[in-house]
């Protein structure tokens, strides 16, 4: 995120020179409309195939959303308020940042979860644990020349699921569309496929995750 900061700041400066800018920051700040739907969490599950779909709201920069594949639950914590993570969780998302609960991840060369199911875990797959990083928690001071960050553990492999191009306004978000393997802290495995970063109305900050667990 840091490497894009000056590109983003320059682009915002250009936008401010335009005449009437009502609504121009909608895609930048990703403010959900008042009519945003409420159907979040594990919206589909299939016990026979051990698969399902998770739909979460990650529009806020101040919030982590925690997902437990074992319990099929989601929970949130406010970073600014210092709220702690729930007792049970497997991975979490903050905007497009992803972290694990003592786990590690691997990006596959597959295109679908069906290919993961048939191909399995590739021989020699190297899983990457979380590393110390920074995530943006407030964009309000961007025009003043700085952003507010929080230092935390983030998984660099899982966080590659979305490429964010801030060289244009509005930013361009491109999912990798690659299934990822998540090794949980207990040694079990899951396959995750991040399908998109928007809802049906094309509002950014809504993530659909297809999964298989246990793999």
Task: Mark where each language-model region is.
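Positively charged n-region of N-terminal signal peptides that target proteins for export
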Residues: 1-4
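Intrinsically disordered, low-complexity segments enriched in serine, threonine, and glycine
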Residues: 8-9
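C-terminal motif of bacterial Sec signal peptides marking the signal peptidase cleavage site
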Residues: 16-20
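Surface-exposed, beta-sheet-biased, low-hydrophobicity segments with strongly acidic/polar composition
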Residues: 22-215
